Amino acid sequence: MTVDNVFIHAVPREQIRRRYSYFEAFEKNCHIQGILSKRALYMLIPCFMEFAVGSIVYSFGVPGWVLGMNTVLAAGFLVMFLFLVWPCFQLVDERQIEEPGEDEMALNAGGYYPYAEEVPPPSYPSLEEENEGNEEIEESEEMNTLLSK
């Protein structure tokens, strides 16, 4: 049992289990997957640009193979977007929590948390002890100066 588990189970379940909006879930899941959301969303820009260019080109009566290539490019960008970004939306949008074991429930029942015990303050050396060390250094420096003469 780790400290994190004890802390998670000590918090009321209502506070932990909350629904995230799709945007929050997208941000969290993109962070988990190592996908920067801005870069992933920027992939939609060329997709829309290709569709826009395709519609403009079509209105001018350009040959069909140009329109076909344009549509293929736009579809390619759309597929790349779907494969890279859409899984972020499909991940869990509610935090999953494992149920606490018997030991953890027994610990939490009494409000006893191992990490909350009082820790004695660190013992610092007294001023006299610190000065003794300084005096020894001063004496050794005096001896060195006398010996060097």
UniProtKB/Swiss-Prot annotation:
The modification Phosphoserine is found at S21. Keywords: Membrane, Phosphoprotein, Transmembrane, Transmembrane helix. Its main location: membrane. The chain crosses the membrane at residues 48-68, 72-92. Residues 127-142 have a biased composition (Acidic residues). It comes from the Eukaryota. It is a multi-pass membrane protein. This is Uncharacterized membrane protein C622.01c. Residues 116-149 are annotated as: Disordered. It is found in: Membrane. GO terms for cellular component: membrane.
